[in-house]
Amino acid sequence: MVESLFPSIENTGESSRRKKPRISETAEAEIEARRVNEESLKRWKTNRVQQIYACKLVEALRRVRQRSSTTSNNETDKLVSGAAREIRDTADRVLAASARGTTRWSRAILASRVRAKLKKHRKAKKSTGNCKSRKGLTETNRIKLPAVERKLKILGRLVPGCRKVSVPNLLDEATDYIAALEMQVRAMEALAELLTAAAPRTTLTGT
């Protein structure tokens, strides 16, 4: 009789284990995303990734130079004016490819060519009046937003493909993107030093 009123400790432990809530799929996805982000941050700091990126960047820039050498004289002026932008876009695409599509920002950069083509077609169909009204609407929304939300919105614009993501995902993507850019700067500085050191030798040998 008394035992029925007071259940044993073993039974209570078993029931508590049964009632333990399971981790939701969203929480599991966030944990997995953070794990991937941590591994990605470590990868950007390794010399091996930097060397691979530098080699791929040199190959990509060489292909760009080969395309420019086949252009006609009439297209030379346009090519020179857009050379800096093409080099920057090439460097960013190689950087995104180095991320192997594990991040949102890398996938956004790789898809930028397709979006640019679609944007040209859509821009021709838009009217001037709609653009003005939309611009005024964004300006009023910018004034109404609090300071923190406004800064997060700016951060979302700076990180490719992160304008409409949650705050935790935005911070993870921004952290990984910054680490990738830092690696990009180190690789470019190393390439610049190599080219500077090789320039006098090339001049002396005449090659």
From Swiss-Prot:
UniProt entry keywords in alphabetical sequence: DNA-binding, Nucleus, Transcription, Transcription regulation
GO MF annotations in UniProt: DNA-binding transcription factor activity; protein dimerization activity; transcription cis-regulatory region binding
Any one annotated GO CC term: nucleus
Subunit comment: Homodimer. Interacts with PRE3.
Protein name: Transcription factor bHLH149
Domain of life: Eukaryota
Keyword hit for Nucleus: yes
InterPro entries: bHLH_AtIBH1-like, bHLH_dom, HLH_DNA-bd_sf, IBH1-like
Subcellular location: Nucleus
Annotated stretches, region: Disordered: 1-25
SUPFAM superfamilies, per the entry: HLH, helix-loop-helix DNA-binding domain
Residues annotated as domain bHLH: 132-181
Function statement: Atypical bHLH transcription factor probably unable to bind DNA. Negatively regulates brassinosteroid signaling.
Record flagged with keyword Secreted: no
